[in-house]
Amino acid sequence: VDELLSEEAVRPRYPYESIVEYDIDEIKHFDIKLGSVNHVKMRAGEGEKIKVQLVSDTIENLTELVKVKIDDIKRRIDVDVNRSKSLSEELVKEHLWIFINLPEKYMGDTELATHCEKLELFDIISEKFELDGAVKEIHIAGGNSHIELDNNSPMEIYVADYTGRIDVNQISAKSRLYVSHEYAFKAVKKGVRTKLLFEEHGNLVDDFSVAESENHIEINGINSELTIVKLSN
């Protein structure tokens, strides 16, 4: 029993992985297409490389079954992740994770297309960051940017220590965005038949946004609803 417990303790959480890296030496526009996966974690940091790491708990031979293609075209970097036809969409949506590191000093505008259960964005610093796809849960931590979430599925969005704009663009969807008790922001409602609601302690409350702030939260689209939830201390 002790031997089994010891083996379990040292066993990696993701036994299968594939890593692709590429050196960058100037500011680039990133166009990243990941397709369907379970979880995407993207971080901007030091260094001069883009690193794409695929990991899985069940999919062996990731390098052969899931291909990462990086194209350097003038001032643009295209990243495409394509799975083998032998892997079903259901399988990768449950058992494939993608971790991406981007060089902060070379980040221009960034476009991300993916369908996933969870997306985490850490320290993203760029003029504009645009998500196109279907994501159920989004975490935005740190960074300074203008983030556009173009997603027609209901979202749970968590914001912490982020500076800048967040635009929620949806059609016929209801989403919730969570902020800390001390987070100050300006709220803007645009679009057609959109609703902007505010919630605290489980109850709808009056608008608790401020008139002017470097942080903007905007709802846009058609027949969509965004509830901004203030979390307790």
Task: Please tell me what each predicted stretch does.
Residues V55-T58, D80-L91:
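Secondary-structure transition/turn motif
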Residues K85-L87, E130, E137-H139, E148:
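Domain-wide signal for the mature, well-folded portions of proteins, strongly enriched
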Residues R75-S86, V205-S209:
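Generic recognition of long tandem-repeat/solenoid scaffolds
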Residues D2-K74, K93, W97-A113, K118-I124, ...:
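Short linear S-[DN]-x-LW-Φ motif typified by the pepsin-like aspartic protease active-site region
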Residues I138-N233:
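Short, surface-exposed interaction patches in beta-rich subdomains
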Residues L87-L91, C116, S172:
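Flexible, surface-exposed loop/linker segments and immediately adjacent secondary-structure boundaries
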